[in-house]
Amino acid sequence: MARRPKGRFIDGIVLLDKDTGMSSNFALQRVKRFFNANKAGHTGALDPLATGMLPICLGEATKFSQHLLDSDKRYLVTAKLGQRTDTSDSDGEVVQTRPVNVTQALLDEKLAFFRGTTQQIPSMYSALKYQGQPLYKYAREGIEVPRESRPITVFELNFIKLEGDELTLDIHCSKGTYIRTIIDDLGEMLGCGAHVVMLRRTQVAEYPYEKMVTLAQLEALLEQAHRQDVAPQTLMDPLLLPMDTAVAKFAEINLPEAMLYYVMQGQAIQAAGLKPDELVRITIGDERRFVGMGIMNDDGLLAPKRLIVIHDNDAAE
């Protein structure tokens, strides 16, 4: 007999405002437990030091988490000038201390280097894998392994303030950009060294900052539900964003209700107005219910590519 998953069949996205000092996986497991979800996944880890936006996908939304992983991000970062650490942040050991003689003109000149598309070598203290192991595991053992540089794009890099030896920047960048590495590289270019002391992710894709919720707020809602003797989901589920917000950047094709059966069977269907190899969101009926993604194949047909499982919301045993 097949084993049924624990938790509810609940689909949606929680915009978690992660606290500092916790891993992204710890935060993920707390959210999963608060919502009593049968399945959950995050969309790109934040360092324990970092705070801010960590979209948590529940249920069928996990099928589309890769699109958020691939999306642009925005960060507010404060760097301490004059000290370089082995991890490029304040969680590491100081390995070099130098005087800070940074003028605004020098800073503006060096910041300009990072704007646009450049090559970046990932930090050894990152989750990127080498021969199946995260780089940080090698780093903790004092082993340095080869890393290939990879292209990143910094769309915006805005100077916020320089107070004493602390520099604050606003950075809008492509996926896979290591902010710690930018700060470490900038410190070397300035001739004084630098490391991250505060990092906050303020945006993922187009998700609004004001929709974020903390673990403390979720816990408070759970306690409120217990006090009022109501089901926790009545207070918590309204916080969920629709799962198709993860793929909002793709065009939508709306099909009549009669086509639902064929789509869910994975059959390619006639659809007008699509370009070859174009990935689209598929919605059904006047209510525009999202059922998954599709792509135009070589025969000029829309082929379902990633479909959700349609289920009722009864809790699993």
Curated annotation (Swiss-Prot):
The active site is at residue 47. The keyword tRNA processing applies. One of its GO terms (biological process) is tRNA pseudouridine synthesis. Its EC number is 5.4.99.25. Pfam families: TruB-C_2, TruB_C_2, TruB_N. Keywords: Isomerase, tRNA processing. Gene3D superfamilies: Pseudouridine synthase, PUA domain. InterPro entries: PsdUridine_synth_cat_dom_sf, PsdUridine_synth_N, PUA-like_sf, PUA_sf, tRNA_psdUridine_synth_TruB, tRNA_sdUridine_synth_fam1_C, TruB_C. The keyword Cytoplasm does not apply. GO terms for molecular function: RNA binding; tRNA pseudouridine(55) synthase activity. It is an enzyme of class 5 (isomerase). It catalyses: uridine(55) in tRNA = pseudouridine(55) in tRNA. Disulfide bonds: none annotated. HAMAP family: TruB_bact. NCBIfam families: TruB. Responsible for synthesis of pseudouridine from uracil-55 in the psi GC loop of transfer RNAs. Belongs to the pseudouridine synthase TruB family. Type 1 subfamily. This is tRNA pseudouridine synthase B. It comes from Shewanella frigidimarina (strain NCIMB 400). The gene is truB.
